[in-house]
Amino acid sequence: MKTFSMVLTLVICLAVGFASGFKTALVRDHNRLERNKQIVSRMFKEVWSNTDTNSALRVADELFQPDFVLHDWTGDTYGLENHKKGIADNRMISPDWNEQPLDMVAEGDKVVSRSLSTGTQRRDIPAIPGYQPVLPATCKFIRFPELAVYRIVNGKLAEQWDFADNWGANIQAGLIDPEKMTFKPASACR
């Protein structure tokens, strides 16, 4: 009977210790997932919705890995410096650009977001060989949804897969004929 009591005590101690360690691991994982979502939230607020381009680019240096890769409908963009050029170009084209996160879910090293992008196209959008001609400035306000998956490594954004409704945005701007689904000349806002 004494042996049974000792074994039972040992089993209880191990179970309590395991449960405590398991709870600690769950809390640690939850905290990491929340930090990852905070990184993505900060990117929306301080990079994409920041009207001060220089400030946005400084924050990008803090939030993105130097070898960051963006995968979107035009192909892949490699490196933070190329991504920062895209951020600056986007701000020049649409000075009032804003990306508002609507939902975020984190799992492992990834964060998935659903957001609403808005802005007024004040300058021409450069041609993308094989995808689109030069799109003249229309001065029209557009809003469109985006879905994105972000991979985070060591507290920084390492990779993004972006799924934006670019066709819808271009239709709103008057740059695509919605019946033919082809680019059309647009009246410039100059």
What are these regions (language model features)?
Residues 1-4:
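Positively charged n-region of N-terminal signal peptides that target proteins for export
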Residues 6-8, 118:
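Short helix-onset patch at the extreme N-terminus, typifying the N->h transition
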Residues 17-190:
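C-terminal and inter-domain tail/linker signature
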Residues 9-17:
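Hydrophobic membrane-insertion alpha-helices, especially the h-region
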